[in-house]
């Protein structure tokens, strides 16, 4: 299913400000998605027109549980800019 590629929306103060000021929505998605795939995914799932896409991969953080160490799962963070007057309800 296509919705499985979207992990969750990012809910930080910075993402809320950009959502209301610039119509930019921030999501964490699967690492394997490319920008054209991300655009098609959001346009079909939410019925919006995506004007711009910015992506980056934040560094993985080290996690320690007892004596063993590991890393948190990697993800890709996406900032979507929508056409004026449109919004995503989540």
From Swiss-Prot:
Keywords assigned by UniProt, alphabetized: Chloroplast, Plastid, Ribonucleoprotein, Ribosomal protein, RNA-binding, rRNA-binding
GO BP: any one term: translation
GO molecular function: rRNA binding; structural constituent of ribosome
Subcellular localization(s) per the UniProt record: Plastid, Chloroplast
Disulfide bridge map: none
This protein's GO CC annotations: chloroplast; ribonucleoprotein complex; ribosome
Main location: plastid
Entries under InterPro entries matching the protein: Nucleotide-bd_a/b_plait_sf, Ribosomal_uL23-like, Ribosomal_uL23/eL15/eS24_sf
Database matches in Pfam families: Ribosomal_L23 (PF00276)
Family (UniProt): Belongs to the universal ribosomal protein uL23 family.
Job of this protein: Binds to 23S rRNA.
Record note on quaternary structure: Part of the 50S ribosomal subunit.
Record's protein name: Large ribosomal subunit protein uL23c
Gene: rpl23
